[in-house]
């Protein structure tokens, strides 16, 4: 992959082979910013996963950095008021299933009660490819609608390892206070360790790096449990 002049200039400003303590790594990422927009800071956690092992879960980052999410709740008519009172942007059953089937996607997150999943599951071609399908593992298939909406609006995010065993997660904006980005990164590292498969072998976390949208990656000398 070819990189432009700005990227190469940023790369020359630090030792790209060195690992830095997390606060310093965050400061470097912010110093290397060169885009005119408020770049997103992303963390990349490389894991040692054996055959058949996977990591997928959710966490509420200590510091939210994105606008409020529009939540759609698939539920029976008798629970619509409960969902809307809890902060859902939309709630209902057949009406919204048909709207989504027709291509309507004016929401950021979908939640469903278990009794709705038989019908919601048929929306896989629309919701699945966009990562919007409700799933029990991410807490978006639940009978406790109010709690789910509350956590989602607080900034609960899903994280999962890709086929290469790497978890990628946005953790802030370069305009944020560095300490808030540090706390968000540390929260992911700690939660990833808590979800370590019981039969995982060797060094579970192989490496951690952070970068901004346009900038180069910075290796992190990470610590667990701080």
Swiss-Prot record:
What Gene3D superfamilies has UniProt attached to this entry?
Answer: 3.30.190.20, 3.40.50.790
The record, for InterPro entries, names:
Ribosom_uL1_bac-type (IPR005878), Ribosomal_uL1 (IPR002143), Ribosomal_uL1-like (IPR023674), Ribosomal_uL1/biogenesis (IPR028364), Ribosomal_uL1_3-a/b-sand (IPR016095), Ribosomal_uL1_CS (IPR023673)
Q: Which GO terms describe its cellular component?
A: large ribosomal subunit
The free-text function statement in the UniProt record for this protein reads:
Binds directly to 23S rRNA. The L1 stalk is quite mobile in the ribosome, and is involved in E site tRNA release.
Cited PANTHER family:
54S RIBOSOMAL PROTEIN L1, MITOCHONDRIAL (PTHR36427), LARGE RIBOSOMAL SUBUNIT PROTEIN UL1M (PTHR36427:SF3)
Q: Which family does it belong to?
A: Belongs to the universal ribosomal protein uL1 family.
Q: Which UniProt keywords apply?
A: Repressor, Ribonucleoprotein, Ribosomal protein, RNA-binding, rRNA-binding, Translation regulation, tRNA-binding
What's a Gene Ontology MF term here? Answer: structural constituent of ribosome
The protein here is known as Large ribosomal subunit protein uL1
Subunit architecture: Part of the 50S ribosomal subunit.
**GO biological process terms on file:** regulation of translation; translation
